[in-house]
Amino acid sequence: MASQGTKRSYEQMETDGERQNATEIRASVGKMIDGIGRFYIQMCTELKLSDYEGRLIQNSLTIERMVLSAFDERRNRYLEEHPSAGKDPKKTGGPIYKRVDGKWMRELVLYDKEEIRRIWRQANNGDDATAGLTHMMIWHSNLNDTTYQRTRALVRTGMDPRMCSLMQGSTLPRRSGAAGAAVKGIGTMVMELIRMIKRGINDRNFWRGENGRKTRSAYERMCNILKGKFQTAAQRAMMDQVRESRNPGNAEIEDLIFSARSALILRGSVAHKSCLPACVYGPAVSSGYDFEKEGYSLVGIDPFKLLQNSQVYSLIRPNENPAHKSQLVWMACHSAAFEDLRLLSFIRGTKVSPRGKLSTRGVQIASNENMDNMESSTLELRSRYWAIRTRSGGNTNQQRASAGQISVQPTFSVQRNLPFEKSTVMAAFTGNTEGRTSDMRAEIIRMMEGAKPEEVSFRGRGVFELSDEKATNPIVPSFDMSNEGSYFFGDNAEDYDN
């Protein structure tokens, strides 16, 4: 993007930093990882977990959720003011899995939020370390993106389930800050705005009074974040229109859905970061690795190297395939739910299959599931190559895509052409070109019509051997274009609903 100079890098967003040079950024991200690792080690001690139990991803998720809940001030305030039966607003907890007499047992633990906050701050040199909390939120969000398809949420807001490649970060909490905003897809931003406009239509006081002023500034801020993700002038102009509307209503919803559809071909820039579970950082820290001193980046080789040397385990339900569970978590670790599967297969070195072909449910285990025949197995999270994460949508072009997902949102900066199914996308653009935004609409449609299949994105960029830490020898992959490129291909993934 042309305006790169005015943007803070992800790592600065991640660490609330002022302008820092590369070394300082690597150190401050490393410091954040150290803090998560130290916290995790301390929690494993508190919970008396064995080394194996501490490397169980389900335990990691529970511990991460406990600290996120302990620091969720708005929800904590709400719980204090609206006490509900059987829920102690001052406590947090969840299922912890232990190996007892050769069987996996579930144990529900409960801790004072105050105590969890104390352990977290102590692990982070007394700071609240918001960046570390956001990092865990993004890991949970990436896992949700890989596990569930947001069909229902899309339909509810009047969008099309085939637009799922725009929905990165749709389950991120609002309090996830600048780092969270950076990883949200176009569809996620559009959905948040549509929900807001619908509330305004149904509730006369939504935009009024003292609260209404705050609401209005939140609305305009979200419009600006979305505008900043678009890469063409016409799409940005359309966002200005939506933002400046006196009284946002159905016309704005129409414009937003139009711009979301257009993003299937004229893709926006969405950041990608490899956020790993806390049970990866903990053992690395306890083995004596100093992330702050060595430096760390979420968008380079570091997460790949870390995963090459990590042992992570997962509980496996009786009819699940451990290799499929591994693929799910591997994709989540690299924020790659909407990347082209052919490229992922190349980087990973083993075939990456569409969601509907995987015999695995989500990673988390519901409290009513029977533990009797639960097994556990090692997650295979290693890769054959590594590649640099991108925050650009790549330039656009087309190719046969699938019935389920009709476009991709690239994760890796690697040369390829980006598949989307032009006829399907363009079919949605018949009709309505009148009204205030008619000239922008016409311009956007013209650009989409002009998108060429043979165009290559990320020209000259390649993947790298894991020994090539300085990224000196790019290997430009060649793909079998007959293979399916979309993950949510005509899919039957469970829907994510809170």
Swiss-Prot record:
A motif (Unconventional nuclear localization signal) lies at residues 1-18. Its main location: virion. Residues 1-21 are annotated as: Disordered. A motif (Bipartite nuclear localization signal) lies at residues 198-216. Late in virus-infected cells, may be cleaved from a 56-kDa protein to a 53-kDa protein by a cellular caspase. This cleavage might be a marker for the onset of apoptosis in infected cells or have a specific function in virus host interaction. Pfam families: Flu_NP. Keywords: Capsid protein, Helical capsid protein, Host nucleus, Host-virus interaction, Ribonucleoprotein, RNA-binding, Viral nucleoprotein, Viral penetration into host nucleus, Virion, Virus entry into host cell. InterPro entries: Flu_NP. Residues 8-21 have a biased composition (Basic and acidic residues). GO terms for cellular component: helical viral capsid; host cell; host cell nucleus; ribonucleoprotein complex; viral nucleocapsid. GO terms for molecular function: RNA binding; structural molecule activity. GO terms for biological process: symbiont entry into host cell; viral penetration into host nucleus. It is found in: Virion; Host nucleus. Belongs to the influenza viruses nucleoprotein family. Homomultimerizes to form the nucleocapsid. May bind host exportin-1/XPO1. Binds to viral genomic RNA. Protein-RNA contacts are mediated by a combination of electrostatic interactions between positively charged residues and the phosphate backbone and planar interactions between aromatic side chains and bases. Encapsidates the negative strand viral RNA, protecting it from nucleases. The encapsidated genomic RNA is termed the ribonucleoprotein (RNP) and serves as template for transcription and replication. The RNP needs to be localized in the host nucleus to start an infectious cycle, but is too large to diffuse through the nuclear pore complex. NP comprises at least 2 nuclear localization signals that are responsible for the active RNP import into the nucleus through cellular importin alpha/beta pathway. This is Nucleoprotein. The gene is NP.
